[in-house]
Amino acid sequence: MGSTAEDFVIKPMKGEHGFGAEIYGLDVNNITDEQVDRLRDTIQRYLLVVLKHQHDETPQKNWELLNRLSPDAPKFTPEEWALMYNPDPQGAGILPKLGYLVLPGTERLFLMGKGYQGEDHWGLKDIDIPEVFADAYYSKPLPHEDYHNGVARFQSWHIDGPSYKIDHPMFTSFRIIKFPEGEQTVDWADGSGLTKKVKAGRTAFFSSAKLYDMLTKEEQAIADYSWAEYMYFPYEWILRCRGNPQGLLVACEGREVPDEQMDAMPRNPEDQLVLPLVWVNPVTGGKHFHVQPNIVRRVFVRSGPDEEPKIIDDVKEVRDFFTKFQYRIIRPENIYVGPEEEGDQLLFFNWGVMHSKIDYPIEMGTRTTHQGWLAGDRPPKGPVPIPDPRARSSIYYQK
């Protein structure tokens, strides 16, 4: 039998990071409609929740929960999904590099992790997931010896989704089945001297609402009235780029796919995302400075409704602009790293937190997770209207 609504216990997390809650007494395999409604509200209020003790959850019930949390999410085929990342129908580009494996009986719930996953993992046979990015990803290399002695980096602070054609997912599910063993020290490696002790195989998060609150009044005005144009097929654009050592942005080394090559890709201009810098939480009304800066092509900057925006389209200047706003949140006390235990399931509000993988060497053990999301059923809203991102008639979008 499923747990009743009265058994659904919310325990807010403690700590300076300022968000998150643990949930007890919920069985995803037998969750009721009433509990789904309450859970949807709770995720948006706390930005991230950890469902405790989900050891017996099936992938099919995991995927079903995502669909019940977002019942109006648009549907698309695996082939349509792949074409959101690259227009090549043969599957060239970022997706083969990531090596996503769909769990049988679901549409897009993925087996993710590292190492040998067993003879039969929910119908996937003899899967051995290799190291993909590991220590070689960064513009400032992480020395091989340090990496294998417990030094780690944040890989890339990001929002889930292709950031092209479909709206960003509201909710992501991330269920932990097996963790590696041991601890690591995340090193910012950017001259700040900052480090953070973490358990291996975990994921890092920060609140974009807390980031907004850290801005000055003048910066908040700019954030409220400005907007960003994301690159089309953005992950193809930065496929060859290397990451900054603290995970924010990518390094400006000229490794982006050249504009003329990107322009040659067949696409619908109306599928390119144009979004406010601030997303308003639909439950709390709180403001989130919510931008994935490494895939923004242009930013339109103003600090009031009657100002003509300044258009920044130099890639380095775009990234410098967002570094000024976002770097301040990347501090140990602002970052939650988790979850703690095998059997925990993270559900996070993709419109309210950004997250980053923390890689580890395979000798620390196998990591097994199930991760999935559905496209948003609408775009996020900012505090003020911006030029219509779906109708490309505005003079701002004429190159």
Swiss-Prot record:
Disulphide bond pairs: none
* A matching Pfam family: TauD
Pathway annotation? Mycotoxin biosynthesis
Quote one Gene Ontology molecular function term.
dioxygenase activity
So which cofactors does this thing need? Fe(2+)
The Enzyme Commission number assigned here is 1.14.11.-
- Quote the SUPFAM superfamilies the UniProt record gives: Clavaminate synthase-like
Q: Where does 2-oxoglutarate bind?
A: 203, 367
Q: How is the cofactor bound?
A: Binds 1 Fe(2+) ion per subunit.
Q: Where is this region: Disordered?
A: 371-399
Its domain of life reads Eukaryota
Q: Which residues bind Fe cation?
A: 158, 160, 355
Q: Which UniProt keywords apply?
A: Dioxygenase, Iron, Metal-binding, Oxidoreductase
Which family does the UniProt entry place this protein in? Belongs to the TfdA dioxygenase family.
Protein's job: Alpha-ketoglutarate-dependent dioxygenase; part of the 2 gene clusters that mediate the biosynthesis of fusicoccins, diterpene glucosides that display phytohormone-like activity and function as potent activators of plasma membrane H(+)-ATPases in plants by modifying 14-3-3 proteins and cause the plant disease constriction canker.
Protein name in the entry: Alpha-ketoglutarate-dependent dioxygenase fc-dox
Q: Which gene encodes it?
A: fc-dox
